[in-house]
From Swiss-Prot:
Function: Excises uracil residues from the DNA which can arise as a result of misincorporation of dUMP residues by DNA polymerase or due to deamination of cytosine.
Subcellular location: Cytoplasm
Record-level GO BP terms: base-excision repair, AP site formation via deaminated base removal
Name of the molecule in the record: Uracil-DNA glycosylase
Listed PROSITE patterns: U_DNA_GLYCOSYLASE (PS00130)
Principal location class: cytoplasm
Amino acid sequence: MDNRTLLNWSSILKNEKKKYYFINIINHLFFERQKKMIFPPKGKVFNAFVHTQLYDIKVVILGQDPYYKINQAHGLAFSVENIVKFIPSSLKNIQKEIISDLGQNRSFSHGCLTKWALQGVFLLNSVLTVEAGKPGSHYKLGWERFTNKVISIINEYCKGVVFLLWGSYAQKKICLIDRTRHYILLAPHPSPLSAYRGFFGCRHFSKTNKILKQQNKSPINWFF
């Protein structure tokens, strides 16, 4: 059997999705969507897994939960739909750091990170859904059990992945990552509250590409 068949998300998460806690999450969302607005839309909750297969992962960026305003969240951490004109502050700060880090006089016309995902950047939120207007509303739904399992799978089946852990919440996942197999870069969260405490100047984008090149992997084109 082709190794890519063995290492695709569909096959490797098949048993996890049969577990009671996961079925309970899906059922809960089904009933919540009958009376509430939930983000991302139903068909986009698992976009991170659609755009970046397990065998393609070079980089993992961990977020918390999705954006809670309409037409923003589409299943990729920190990313917004390319039709969105207002770029969230954290993403705007990420863009600023990319420009500063890479020393290129370029600008961004949108905030959609799909091109990152297609290059092997796995954009995973720890919690995959949120109720409109209520940040953190699905923290107790059980998503973290699932996404912790996903991180553990990446840790086990991949090698030389660069984990970008921004902020204390993401950095709690360090215990799931084997530092002898992977690389971990730490920085404060890019939100306006903490970006000036060390996210700006962290140079994670150039550092990541340097690590990838050392492994004979193609670097990421961070401009989108």
